[in-house]
Amino acid sequence: TVIGYTGTKGKTTSVYFTRHVMAKALGKVVAQLSSIDECLDGETFIPAHLTTPESLDLFRMMKEAVDNQMKYLVMEVSSQAYKKSRVFGLPLDIGVFLNISPDHISPVEHPSFEDYLACKSEIIDNCRILVVNRECSQYDYLAEKAHDLGKQVISFGSDQSAADYQYRLGEHGHFTVTTANPALP
């Protein structure tokens, strides 16, 4: 099972959080690829060089994780990963779109917001299930694209009337997640 996160902000934190929760629940069977480090055996973390590794490195790392009996991979998927075909041919079981803002518009990265959005939204083409922030400025576009491609869409957000899953932040880092639809996974 491969879970990929994209977003201008929050990819690394979300990957760490997800891997930690999954490892607590499932044991040492969760690999991680992030901009900070990589874990291919469920225990050992080594420094990373890119947010998303180059294609050949990525697939080599995935093979190593499988050889190490990893059943899950939680990873960051940057806009550059799609722009430079680093994740070409990589299907995601779950793609998570956190947010988008014009931080990476430049001659070096993306010439326009439209190019940036197009690259980031490729996660929809490559995932089976899209989990998307209901409060993302491009939510309607992303959800429509996913529905047009026949993808399941699950939303999250703090607005209880709009998202499938709602969160409420408490004190000291505590939070509560609720859903009005018990049929959702």
Per-region residue spans from a language model:
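Short, surface-exposed amphipathic charged segments that create phosphate/polyanion-binding patches used
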Residues: P47-H49, H110, A162-V177
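Nucleotide phosphate-binding/pyrophosphate-handling subdomain across enzymes
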Residues: F88, E171-P185
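Phosphate-binding loop of NTP-binding sites
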Residues: T1-L130, R134, Q138-K151
